[in-house]
């Protein structure tokens, strides 16, 4: 299994995206969070289709921090069920991956 992962999280406002990004990095749960503004999201929720503008957070971290990160996001997110999806990083620039290891707490 890969030691590192990218996690996608959506937020409904810039303020919330900034709060989550900063909180994850300050808590050493993430090395870097990139924010894409005004993502067009179409999704099914509570028996209907919704279309919203959201902010997409791309989080770079360690696999062993996923559970702690998920808990932190659920406790600090305005959505009842926030999008939190993790994908393994199979390859990457070694110096960048070392940066993740140097910043993010290891279990």
Cite the ranges covered by each PLM segment.
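Positively charged, small/polar-rich N-terminal and surface patches that mediate targeting and assembly
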Residues: 1-107
